[in-house]
Amino acid sequence: MYCLQWLLPVLLIPKPLNPALWFSHSMFMGFYLLSFLLERKPCTICALVFLGALFLICYSCWGNCFLYHCSASELPEAAHDPAVVGT
């Protein structure tokens, strides 16, 4: 389970508030995970635990999934602030 210490913090990286940056963020995270899995080759148990956690986070649609934005979840309140979106 040593390899999980490099995978689990990835789930804690927040999604950007600006909706225009969601695609770039999801591409970066996807390429990071792919390169990590190819380079470090974590054990099967660690990979399954991480993919299970990622599936549960994305399936719950709490807005924490970095792969896509759930249509049922609302935007954060700060996303409607022009000072935040304009940055």
Curated annotation (Swiss-Prot):
Subcellular location: Cytoplasm; Nucleus; Membrane
Residues annotated as transmembrane: 19-39, 43-63
Domain of life of the organism encoding this protein: Eukaryota
Chief place where the protein resides: cytoplasm
Lipid bilayer topology: Multi-pass membrane protein
SMART domains: BC10
Keywords from the named record: Cytoplasm, Membrane, Nucleus, Transmembrane, Transmembrane helix, Tumor suppressor
One Pfam short name: BC10
One of the record's GO cellular component terms: cytoplasm
Similarity section: Belongs to the BLCAP family.
Function comment: Acts as a tumor suppressor; induces growth arrest at G(1)/S checkpoint and apoptosis via RB1-dependent and p53/TP53- and NF-kappa-B-independent mechanisms. Modulates expression of genes involved in the regulation of proliferation, cell cycle and apoptosis.
Protein name: Apoptosis inducing factor BLCAP A
Classification of source organism: Eukaryota, Metazoa, Chordata, Craniata, Vertebrata
